[in-house]
Amino acid sequence: MVKISVIGSGGWGIALAILLHKNGHNLTIWSFDKKEAEELKINRQNKTKLPNILLPEDIKVTDNLKEAVDNKDILVLAVPSKAIRSVSKSLKDIIKDNQIIVNVAKGLEEDTLKTMTDIIEEELKEKNPQVAVLSGPSHAEEVGKGIPTTCVVSAHNKELTLYLQNIFMNPSFRVYTSPDMIGVEIGGALKNVIALAAGIADGLNYGDNTKAALITRGIKEISSLGVAMGGEQSTFYGLTGLGDLIVTCASMHSRNRRAGILLGQGKTLDEAIKEVNMVVEGIYSAKSALMAAKKYNVEIPIIEQVNAVLFENKNAAEAVNELMIRDKKLEIQSW
């Protein structure tokens, strides 16, 4: 029995804890919020972030980080991307050397453009952690119910990747492996920005044609920027790129799409965030993506317009119109 602690008590953290518990492992969940931890202990569910999905009674819940981390074989970091650095700093003095850490947050740090695993390794370098990433088209609402789902795990070495594949995989949760950590993380971060665009189109009551165009041209932007940042192009057309993009653009489970819908309906950014009432990772990743595109000289017109709607109060319909009247282009640069 492997001892695992899930650091973060949001929907994704709870869903993964339930999954890993089903796989026969010993589970602890850590919550930053003492009140939320007490509610989880009593009600065995997070009624706000993942309602009606119950934690087994033998999954331990704590708000004490040292208690959560002590003597654990694996730590799963399931906190929002903006909290990865602060949580990593908090782990610095309490984790063991060579601790296995699996990041499941999706995002890029705004100022540095670092991936989540880059941040973890930077903050914990003195402990030489074994860091990996798990990503893919995987809404917590479905994983928590055992609905068939596929993901990808990636680490710096094949041995750790295969070990974690066995830890997470079961008949309802199929895990593939990849050597491309950079591509896996960038795909997971940037798809949230395109999902905001898809939601905006839905909020404007545009149709399936528009959605198909945004997904297809969106994955082109993701892959172009991702390759420039060091990822492999094939990764962006797999589960952690195109697969994650499709589910995030199409599903009502997607908080990024829901936020986009509200923006398309004329709500302000603050109003949309308040109504979604969960972290909308694409908002943070949008700024990072724009910074990265300027750094690497990559054209990302959809992501540029999303930034304009988010941070410059640009009218959503006007943003879509500007995408449609851009200069004529080849679809694929092969002529």
UniProtKB/Swiss-Prot annotation:
It is found in: Cytoplasm. It comes from the Bacteria. The keyword NADP applies. The active site is at residue 191. Pfam families: NAD_Gly3P_dh_C, NAD_Gly3P_dh_N. Its EC number is 1.1.1.94. The keyword Magnesium does not apply. Keywords: Cytoplasm, Lipid biosynthesis, Lipid metabolism, NAD, NADP, Nucleotide-binding, Oxidoreductase, Phospholipid biosynthesis, Phospholipid metabolism. Pathway: Membrane lipid metabolism; glycerophospholipid metabolism. GO terms for biological process: carbohydrate metabolic process; glycerol-3-phosphate biosynthetic process; glycerol-3-phosphate catabolic process; glycerol-3-phosphate metabolic process; glycerophospholipid metabolic process; phospholipid biosynthetic process. It is an enzyme of class 1 (oxidoreductase). Its main location: cytoplasm. One of its GO terms (molecular function) is glycerol-3-phosphate dehydrogenase [NAD(P)+] activity. Sn-glycerol 3-phosphate binds at residues 106, 136, 138, 191, 244, 254-256. It catalyses: sn-glycerol 3-phosphate + NAD(+) = dihydroxyacetone phosphate + NADH + H(+); sn-glycerol 3-phosphate + NADP(+) = dihydroxyacetone phosphate + NADPH + H(+). GO terms for cellular component: cytosol. Belongs to the NAD-dependent glycerol-3-phosphate dehydrogenase family. Catalyzes the reduction of the glycolytic intermediate dihydroxyacetone phosphate (DHAP) to sn-glycerol 3-phosphate (G3P), the key precursor for phospholipid synthesis. This is Glycerol-3-phosphate dehydrogenase [NAD(P)+]. The lineage of its organism: Bacteria, Fusobacteriati, Fusobacteriota, Fusobacteriia, Fusobacteriales.
